[in-house]
Regions:
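Short alpha-helix in the alpha/beta-hydrolase fold that links the catalytic acid
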Residues: 328, 342-351
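Conserved alpha/beta-hydrolase
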Residues: 154, 159-182
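An N-terminal hydrophobic leader/cap segment in hydrolases
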Residues: 2-119, 124-134, 275
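Catalytic active-site module of serine/aspartate enzymes centered on a nucleophile-bearing elbow/loop
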Residues: 357, 361-396
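Alpha/beta-hydrolase-fold enzymes
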Residues: 10-12, 16-26, 216-304, 308
């Protein structure tokens, strides 16, 4: 394990991934010139816009736009919505069944826990979890924002490690994830996730006045947390943020994909991009952790949806242009063998951020899901130690 060290070696190939499942789209260097690619992208984008206008006009003026066809379309939408609502009910029931405490050999309960629903920024129901020390006041709170396609219940072990050290833990399932509302694996906007985090922070501050609060985000959740920290009204509520394997730099499968992604995300936002459904990249060196993840019915394992992929590209572009604006105390952790997100981007964050209090951990040979690696307890202890040191700095 290294502190503040770089990751050696360049790569001729990058990956775009769905984050939680390790599905990838290879990113190859283009053989075309930059100017040629730009011209081609503009031409393709223009063509798509004209096609959209043509289809829209025919749809409005054509014979299909009859009362009977509209009624049929309405029935299809209602059936689709009913199926989505049924899936949400199924997932919420599964989320309630997730084990919230580990077996204690001595039969003692050192943690109290609860699950609850919070109305999100758009009145969507957010499924949340709480773990807290059973016999002591919380000396701090960590809010966990999971990665793409997973859910908050996976962080039980780390949560109990935190409560043992006197920290309370809140965790929220994103929209379209775990027990929260929304189509499974579909994220209309990662800005919605930021707004929902703000709603949860309101509740936490109201219930725990004066208790210092940290945010932790994993993978795409790390990108969301980093962007959230750039908003002053969120930044002022936090003592610091922790980022594990953050998705800061993500490239599309081809430059043209980046050019047309905004259009496709509007035309067919929920379409599943099966070309990205490639398996084989391990995210942990612990076989038991991999088995638990991919056999979990609350982990989305289908192809990434078009709008979701576009949102990842969008937040990545935003962050890369705003690293110098980061001022919040932060700790970033990354495995050097991570093939899902780029450890070099974490190094860039550490180098460019304006934060006075910043720390970095690079773990030689470790993979993407750091809190599910065999050394998870050591990594968790380093995070807790960083929070302790940050709190001491605030009192100086």
């Amino acid at each position: 394990m290294e502190r503040g060290a770089g990751v050696g070696g360049g790569q001729d190939e990058m990956m775009m991934t769905s984050g939680a499942t390790g599905r990838i789209v290879p990113v190859f260097r283009s053989v075309l010139s930059r100017r040629a690619l730009l011209r081609l992208a503009v031409a393709v984008q223009t063509l798509f816009l004209w096609l959209l206008l043509l289809v829209d006009r025919r749809r409005r003026a054509g014979p299909d736009a009859s009362p009977s066809s509209e009624a049929g379309s309405g029935k299809t939408r209602r059936r689709r919505m009913a199926a989505e609502e049924e899936d949400v009910r199924r997932r919420r029931a599964l989320a309630e069944e997730v084990v919230m405490e580990e077996d204690d050999a001595e039969g003692e309960r050192g943690t109290r826990w609860a699950t609850f629903l919070v109305p999100g920024a758009r009145r969507n129901a957010l499924f949340c979890r709480l773990w807290a020390p059973a016999a002591a006041e919380m000396r701090g709170i960590l809010v966990i924002i999971h990665g793409l396609n997973e859910h908050s219940g996976r962080y039980l072990h780390f949560a109990e490690q935190l409560t043992t050290c006197g920290f309370g833990v809140y965790a929220m399932d994103w929209i379209g994830h775990g027990g929260s509302d929304g189509l499974h694996g579909y994220v209309p906007s990662l800005d919605y996730v930021i707004e929902d985090i703000e709603v949860l922070l309101d509740k936490i501050m109201e219930e725990n006045p004066g208790v210092p609060c940290f945010l932790l985000g994993h993978s795409t959740g790390g990108a969301v947390v980093l962007k959230a920290s750039l908003y002053p009204h969120i930044r002022e509520r936090l003592e610091g943020i922790i980022l594990t394997s953050p998705a800061i730099r993500v490239k599309p499968a081809h430059p043209i994909v980046g050019a047309v992604a905004p259009i496709f995300s509007l035309v067919a936002p929920k379409f599943q991009f099966k070309g990205a459904n490639k398996r084989g990249i391990p995210v942990s060196r612990d076989p038991a952790a991999l088995l638990a993840k991919y056999s979990d019915p609350l982990v989305y394992t289908g192809p990434i949806r078009v709008r979701t992929g576009h949102e990842i590209l969008r937040i990545s572009s935003f962050l890369l242009h705003n690293l110098k604006k980061v001022t919040i105390p932060f700790m970033v952790l990354h495995g050097t063998a991570d093939r899902v997100t780029d450890p070099l981007a974490s190094q860039d964050l550490y180098n460019e951020a304006a934060s006075r209090h910043k720390d970095m951990r690079l773990y030689d040979g470790f993979l993407h899901d750091l809190l599910f690696e065999p050394e998870r307890d050591e990594i968790g202890a380093e995070i807790i130690d960083w929070m302790d040191r940050t709190l001491r700095l605030q009192t100086v």
